[in-house]
Amino acid sequence: MNSLNKTGLLYIVPTPIGNLSDITYRAVETLKNVNLIAAENIHHTNILLQHYNVKNILISLNKNNEKKQSDYVINELKKGKKIALVSDAGTPVINDPGYFLVKKCCFLNIKIIPLPGPCAAITALSASGISTNRFCYEGFLPSKKKIRRDLLKSLKKEIRTIIFYESKHRILESIKDIIETIDENRYLVIAREITKKWEYIYGAKANIILSWLKEDQSRYKKGEIVIIIDGFKELKNKDISAKAINTLTILRNFLSLKQSVFITSKIHKIKKNDLYQHAIKEKDK
């Protein structure tokens, strides 16, 4: 008999991200039938279990004790026990404790059964109106300003949709950093309190988002926020803004075409060749 048959099973069980109704029948049945539940926060998980009349043994597995508790869980799995891993909200391991446990299970060939379920990033993305074909998930934005800004700068020309989490305490600073490092005109969506009473999903250019948040503190003073940034798009000739065309036209009254194009490209961050092509087309009209 191989080691896979001797050991137990680790179930990765997603839990609601706000609305207690957002849990699958399979998830509830799994929580009822496993030998024990490894929870990020026992008190928080007990609220969910009581709601669904689930009675089971709970142990704590959080960011502070994850490495130590993973060893305990592994030993229990080796005895043939079935164990469920849950976080406070959403899918475990995704920005939540559980990585070390899952990694050890993979190394030891202990079977893992992941259940599908809630994830704030994916839920927000589905309703954002921003491309979902390709995206990168960056987790929580760094709390330190320089590290955060360096990360944002590195993503300025990322063509995929970008997803972040951010706290209510830093949302204004992070939006400011997006404006200053990426582009004030980049389209964003912010989704707060997904599935909860005060849920909202709002999309606009970055500078408008910042003004909108500042108008009413209640828009960001509670809950965590998902930030979704539209991917970088190269400006094509037809996409040259009216402001850029106006700048080029004014400069042409005083400077050569070469000088006018150079200055306009710097101001509006447009390729010089696109501006040349536009000027030539206008001349030929």
From Swiss-Prot:
Write down the superkingdom of origin: Bacteria
Q: Which InterPro entries match?
A: 4pyrrol_Mease, 4pyrrol_Methylase_sf, 4pyrrole_Mease_sub1, 4pyrrole_Mease_sub2, rRNA_ssu_MeTfrase_I, SAM_MeTrfase_RsmI_CS
Q: Localized where?
A: Cytoplasm
Q: Give the EC number.
A: 2.1.1.198
Q: Which PROSITE patterns match?
A: RSMI
Catalytic activity from the UniProt record: cytidine(1402) in 16S rRNA + S-adenosyl-L-methionine = 2'-O-methylcytidine(1402) in 16S rRNA + S-adenosyl-L-homocysteine + H(+)
| Pfam families on file | TP_methylase
Record's GO cellular component, any one? Answer: cytoplasm
* Leading EC class: transferase
Alphabetically sorted, this entry's keywords are:
Cytoplasm, Methyltransferase, rRNA processing, S-adenosyl-L-methionine, Transferase
> Example GO molecular function term?
rRNA (cytosine-2'-O-)-methyltransferase activity
Question: What is this protein for, i.e. what is its function?
Answer: Catalyzes the 2'-O-methylation of the ribose of cytidine 1402 (C1402) in 16S rRNA.
* PANTHER family tied to this protein: RIBOSOMAL RNA SMALL SUBUNIT METHYLTRANSFERASE I (PTHR46111:SF1)
NCBIfam families for this protein: 16S rRNA (cytidine(1402)-2'-O)-methyltransferase (TIGR00096)
* Homology family: Belongs to the methyltransferase superfamily. RsmI family.
In its UniProt entry, what is this protein called? Ribosomal RNA small subunit methyltransferase I
Q: Which organism is it from?
A: Buchnera aphidicola subsp. Schizaphis graminum (strain Sg)
Corresponding gene? rsmI
